[in-house]
Amino acid sequence: MSYTIAAEIRTEIGKGSSRRLRHANKVPAVIYGAGKEPISIKFDHKDIINIQENADFYSSDLTITVDGKDVKVRVQAMQRHAFKGLIEHIDFKFA
């Protein structure tokens, strides 16, 4: 099964801006690898929380739409809050 997720480019990077995103129910993320420049992005938490419950989310290629362009990626790592179950950050790798 393939998933398509809409994302926005992040202009502010760092701990403070990531915290502000999380308080606004956004998930900070980064796409990196394959000799390309890393792309810092953000998602709506509700968009990602439901699809990440499927095992296919972690093992198959995903499509992330960033500024109208489709980018094929795989989940590399995901950080969660210790007891709330919220997603705090996702690392994607170019597929």
From Swiss-Prot:
The lineage of its organism: Bacteria, Pseudomonadati, Pseudomonadota, Gammaproteobacteria, Alteromonadales. Belongs to the bacterial ribosomal protein bL25 family. PANTHER family: RIBOSOMAL PROTEIN L25/GLN-TRNA SYNTHETASE, ANTI-CODON-BINDING DOMAIN-CONTAINING PROTEIN, RIBOSOMAL PROTEIN L25_GLN-TRNA SYNTHETASE, ANTI-CODON-BINDING DOMAIN-CONTAINING PROTEIN. HAMAP family: Ribosomal_bL25. Coiled coil: none annotated. This is one of the proteins that binds to the 5S RNA in the ribosome where it forms part of the central protuberance. This is Large ribosomal subunit protein bL25. GO terms for biological process: translation. GO terms for cellular component: cytosolic large ribosomal subunit. InterPro entries: Rbsml_bL25/Gln-tRNA_synth_N (IPR020056), Ribosomal_bL25/Gln-tRNA_synth (IPR011035), Ribosomal_bL25_short (IPR020055), Ribosomal_L25_dom (IPR029751), Ribosomal_uL5_bac-type (IPR020930). One of its GO terms (molecular function) is structural constituent of ribosome. Part of the 50S ribosomal subunit; part of the 5S rRNA/L5/L18/L25 subcomplex. Contacts the 5S rRNA. Binds to the 5S rRNA independently of L5 and L18. Keywords: Ribonucleoprotein, Ribosomal protein, RNA-binding, rRNA-binding. The keyword Nucleotidyltransferase does not apply. It comes from Shewanella sediminis (strain HAW-EB3).
